[in-house]
Amino acid sequence: METIALLAALFFIALTCFLTSGRRRNLPPGPYPLPIIGNMLQLGSNPHQSFAQLSKKYGPLMSIHLGSLYTVIVSSPEMAKEILHKHGQAFSGRTIAQAVHACDHDKISMGFLPVTSVWRDLRKICKEQMFSHQSLEASEGLRHQKLQQLLDYAQKCCETGRAVDIREASFITTLNLMSATMFSTQATEFESEATKEFKEIIEGVATIVGVPNFADYFPILKPFDLQGIKRQADGYFGRLLKKIEGYLNERVESRRLNPDAPRKNDFLETVVDIIEADEYKLTTDHLTHLMLDLFVGGSETNTTSLEWIMSELVINPDKMAKVKDEIKSVVGDKKIVDESEMPRLPYLQAAIKEVLRIHPPGPLLLPRRAEIDQEVNGYLIPKGTQILFNAWAIGRDPSIWKNPESFEPERFLDQTVDFKGQDFELIPFGSGRRICPGMPLANRILHMTTATLVHNFDWKLEEETANADHQDELFGLAVRRAVPLKIIPLRP
């Protein structure tokens, strides 16, 4: 027994020396890590909030240990700019969660590939073909159809006095907007069994990627899959890929049988063009996994953001009235706003920026990884370090924003700050070479859906949830409201 106790003591001493040796290597400051678990007990249920509190003590570049995973938390625009732009190449890698290994997604997905020629080809396709201004303009009519379906559903609820579950409605609408833009089809319908199945798959992928997994912090556990996360991820990823492959195979066969048929204005047409032209060194798997990334990422983040937008507007009726009056002055009695009219709606744009400041859908963005040893602000960030950017903390920093906890769209009316990656005080979509490729479509979806709901109805909180804490958050791949927003549409 004494020998075992001695060996255990020596082990813990050695481990502690290892964990604390970073301070002698001039790593960024941070809280003292416990043996084995590091700082995991300090995370709480909302890690972005815990990191924000810790950064007040340790600064905007902070070290923590998540089990054996050494991590640096970035909590200021200055540090974010230095890492994402000045040292963008050094920090271009990704930390890959075990769930992302499902169906070899980590080896194929643009979101997780290293910066190689394949990655560059995929980014080029997104920028120049899928999300170009011309492509998005061509598919606007499809999005109008899906917004009309949302309008019809809300009208039925209005007539019966029934509350709209905004998360559910936003999910279905976003999914259909994404499906229309990508496949010229409708993925789901309001109040249908097919909706429940598709929702289960999409939310399953988003949840399983976002759920804490001990194997990500203690790699020795990866072969055992103790939480069953890899097994569940294989199931969800496989089901979604099968659906996407079905759409692709159907389009390829349709073109083969009818080569002179009119082209459709969707992403799938672009994908088939790429396959037939063989211009890029890409496989069909690269393209189907790209569509999976866009589908899941776009559906989850847009749904979450739309729920927060409507939440803030409903609990701030004076701001809602300003958005409504502005839309009315531009479009009159027309039910759905044209995307070309968005530049004439500065207060709506400001309101959406304000929501993305307070409630960035991914508060820590997607993790980066240091590809080399790199000095930042006088500190060493070793190769292999995970980098997290606390966009939530930056958006609520009182040294940057006046009254940061208040919902004040007016703050954006007299400044040029935008969320497109150049203004580091507002980076809900990231920045640099790995900025979210679907941002141009997300921008249209958020503005158009919000405008449709606000313009056509007045809204009031359902009595059952009227007294809920409307700022409570539920952490995941995207941070949603802890209590789903249920509001009743009224005739204006």
UniProtKB/Swiss-Prot annotation:
CDD domains: CYP76-like. Ferruginol is a widespread diterpenoid metabolite that serves as a bioactive natural product in its own right, and has been shown to exhibit a range of activities similar to that of the tanshinones such as anti-tumor and antibacterial properties. It therefore contributes to the medicinal effect of Isodon rubescens. It comes from Isodon rubescens (Rabdosia rubescens). The chain crosses the membrane at residues 1-21. One of its GO terms (biological process) is terpenoid biosynthetic process. Residues 22-492 are cytoplasmic. Its EC number is 1.14.14.175. Pathway: Secondary metabolite biosynthesis; terpenoid biosynthesis. It catalyses: abieta-8,11,13-triene + reduced [NADPH--hemoprotein reductase] + O2 = ferruginol + oxidized [NADPH--hemoprotein reductase] + H2O + H(+). PANTHER family: CYTOCHROME P450, FAMILY 76, SUBFAMILY C, POLYPEPTIDE 5-RELATED (PTHR47950), GERANIOL 8-HYDROXYLASE-LIKE (PTHR47950:SF4). It is an enzyme of class 1 (oxidoreductase). This is Ferruginol synthase. Abietane diterpenoids (e.g. miltiradiene, abietatriene and ferruginol) accumulate specifically in the periderm of roots. The ent-kaurene diterpenoid oridonin, main constituent of Isodon rubescens, accumulates in leaves.
